[in-house]
Amino acid sequence: MANGLNAGKKLMKSRKTYRWSDRDYKRRVLNLKKKSDPLEGAPQAKGIVIEKVGIEAKQPNSGIRKCVKIQLIKNGRQLSAFAPGDGAINYIDEHDEVVVEGIGGRMGRSKGDIPGVRYKVIKVNGISLHELVKGRKEKTVR
């Protein structure tokens, strides 16, 4: 490594080169998160429910976490989304239009004991899933 009064350019050049070894730098500069993200960088997205699935919780927990398989409207990509709340899966039917958002795991990944699920359902046919579970609102018949 050069050091001296006139070594600035060399130092800058070598920093620029070695910075590409940093995974986070590379992902940020090349916009890799946005390119691989099914939501394409948006906070929420609409989709159509394809099927209901039960995903088994990771060790040491046991139980079946109720999730839905969704096809996004804007790009046709498929993803799994968790249905939060007691009996929430009963308010979601196939071919319903749902709104999904990130589940809130660290670094945009899955949360807790639900493997491979990075999103959660927040609305069903334009009505908040939380309100449906609480019984404050009823699901409209389309």
Swiss-Prot record:
Entry GO CC: small ribosomal subunit
InterPro entries reported in the protein's UniProt record: NA-bd_OB-fold, Ribosomal_uS12, Ribosomal_uS12_arc, Ribosomal_uS12_euk/arc
Gene Ontology terms: biological process: translation
Keywords: Ribonucleoprotein, Ribosomal protein, RNA-binding, rRNA-binding
Single GO molecular function: rRNA binding
Gene3D superfamilies hit by this protein: Nucleic acid-binding proteins
Keyword match GTP-binding: no
SUPFAM superfamilies: Nucleic acid-binding proteins
Described purpose of this protein according to its UniProt entry: With S4 and S5 plays an important role in translational accuracy. Located at the interface of the 30S and 50S subunits.
HAMAP family (UniProt xref): Ribosomal_uS12_A
Similarity field: Belongs to the universal ribosomal protein uS12 family.
Subunit structure: Part of the 30S ribosomal subunit.
Name of this protein: Small ribosomal subunit protein uS12
Lineage of producing organism: Archaea, Methanobacteriati, Thermoplasmatota, Thermoplasmata, Thermoplasmatales
Encoding gene (name): rps12
